[in-house]
Amino acid sequence: QEREFIYEIFEEICGARLTTNIGRIGGFERDFNAVAFEKIREFLKRYPPVLKEFEEMFVRNRIFIERTSGVAAVTPEEALDYGWSGPILRATGVDYDVRVQNPYCSYEEFDFDVPVGATGDVYDRFMVRNEEMWQSLRIIEQALEKIEKEPKGVFHAEVPDFYLPPKEQVYTNMEALIYHFKIVMGEVDTPKAEVYHAVEGANGELGFYLIHDGGRSPYRLHFRRPSFVNY
């Protein structure tokens, strides 16, 4: 039921439940509407009781603890050797979160805690993920407050060389049409460079490694997927 409500929020924001393709270089494809804000506020009110009920069922459940405590324990050294990241790495006691060590998207402006385990067993992995849901609620609440303070209609950076102009401008403005053509036809040249950027995904570090040789398409693009490494 709660997951369905989250899908409704996604659909209200970007028009799709799963393929949430709203992000663009320097911002978003469109601004959030009033209904989306209302749904997010409702979610912030209705989800904490669900989490508390969830905790009552598992956190102090003797059967659950006996089946998870001490099971499949992994040391910090082993986790690092495996290349783990995200919640399962932090469950071993390694305090590493991309949002804190290499902040992006204004994460340095948010106040939240990074839950860290001690034994690296199944119970600690569960507890880390459980606490991260609480921290996510804190981040969402702060982000919502910051967005509401921003000027209305400002949802992307002014970078016409890389950001597709609105369709209505393409049909009526020659400059917008030129930028649209350059981006779509791949006529935006970029310098020779090599870059790696990562974000903190739900399952760990999601990285993007890009090599460019100066042409109009990447020489090499590789995705560092956390699930592939973790499992």
Predicted regions and their residues:
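Metal/cofactor-centered catalytic core regions of large enzymes
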Residues: 1-231
